Amino acid sequence: MVMVTQKIYIELKAFDSYLLDRSARSIILTAKRSGARVNGPIFFPRRVAKFIVNRSTHVDKKSREQFEIRTHKRLISLPKANSTIIQALMSLQLPAGVDVKVKVIGGSNNG
């Protein structure tokens, strides 16, 4: 039997850091239960986008309102993932506020 191993990078993005950490923890626990070696979660710097808007529609330039969006990011690396680990991760249910990008690299034959 030929076992194909792949390197998988899972990038998580969310506006809520609590939701993001909970999702990362569930991915890591699922991967470890399946027998994978896990690197991470690797924390990326928080991105803050600030928007400054005039409160008034016409005059009063001094009266402004500030809004910001904070984007949190985490990276989880699975150096040697096989098909059982991938199936376990596919069946995982994550919250709606978390954006997940999966990058699969390689496919070397061991065995």
Curated annotation (Swiss-Prot):
What function does the entry list? Involved in the binding of tRNA to the ribosomes.
Protein's name in the database: Small ribosomal subunit protein uS10
Subunit comment for this entry?
Part of the 30S ribosomal subunit.
Entry keyword set? Ribonucleoprotein, Ribosomal protein
User: Which parts of the chain span the membrane according to its record?
Assistant: none
Output the Gene Ontology terms for molecular function: structural constituent of ribosome; tRNA binding
**Which Pfam families does the record associate with it?**
Ribosomal_S10 (PF00338)
Query: Any one Gene Ontology biological process term?
Result: translation
Origin superkingdom: Bacteria
Q: Listed GO cellular component terms? A: ribonucleoprotein complex; ribosome
HAMAP family assigned: Ribosomal_uS10
Report the source organism. Answer: Ehrlichia ruminantium (strain Welgevonden)
Its gene?
A: rpsJ
Similarity remark: Belongs to the universal ribosomal protein uS10 family.
Q: Which InterPro entries match?
A: Ribosomal_uS10 (IPR001848), Ribosomal_uS10_dom (IPR027486), Ribosomal_uS10_dom_sf (IPR036838)
